[in-house]
A protein has these predicted regions:
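Short, hydrophobic secondary-structure boundary micro-motifs
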Residues: 10-11, 79-81, 86-87, 124-127, ...
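A hydrophobic, helix-centered structural microdomain
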Residues: 1-33, 70, 144-166
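A short, structured surface patch at a secondary-structure boundary
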Residues: 43-106, 150-158
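Short, glycine-rich, amphipathic interfacial segments at transmembrane boundaries or analogous
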Residues: 8-49, 110-133
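C-terminal terminal-structure detector
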Residues: 96-166
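Gly/Ser/Thr-rich helix-start
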Residues: 5-7, 17, 55, 75, ...
Length: 166
């Protein structure tokens, strides 16, 4: 990257359909750390690991574009619950009885919680619960019309990012 030496792509193991692990791709928006330990920490607002151009591509969701490769590989869908890190899947599966419901479908590049503005760091259990409830509703009420609505709302948020975008 121009402002931060290191690989162009960020790769991380995430939980996919049925909990099967896959490697998610993103444009790297944070400083590269050789240890990889920082990669396991969730990005936060004003994160010192993010460099200037990285903040820009995150705000406008440009860092997510490589996930279309994941869609072509069959690991992800355009719309679905966003995939979490495998470690988070394990913890959430213990805390939320119905958590595995969100893994009945492929994870999405965008999802119901993201187009509702619930993106970014998880700052409270209530926010996490709200995201999961939206994912459960999506899985139980899937339709092509619902996917089209989510894609349209996501497109609007890419053009006019919400306050939660950083």
């Amino acid at each position: 990257c121009i402002q931060s030496p290191g690989p162009v792509f960020f790769r991380q193991k995430r939980g996919g359909k049925g909990g099967a692990p896959f490697t998610i791709l993103k444009f790297r928006s944070m400083k590269h750390r050789a240890s990889g330990v920082a990669d396991e920490l969730q990005a936060m607002r004003n994160d010192d690991r993010t460099y200037a151009f990285g903040r820009f591509i995150r705000k406008f969701s440009i860092d997510e574009f490589p996930q279309f490769i994941n869609v072509l590989l069959g690991d992800m869908s355009l719309v679905g619950p966003r995939p979490y890190m495998i470690e988070h899947d394990k913890l959430l599966g213990k805390d939320f009885r119905a958590y595995r419901v969100r893994q009945f479908v492929k994870p999405g590049v965008t999802g119901p919680a993201q187009c509702a503005g619930l993106r970014g760091e998880v700052v409270s259990p209530d926010l996490l619960h709200a995201r999961n409830e939206m994912d459960f509703h999506y899985v139980g009420n899937w339709s092509l019309l619902l996917d089209m609505e989510i894609v349209l709302k996501t497109a609007i948020q890419v053009i006019i990012p919400p306050q939660s975008a950083y």
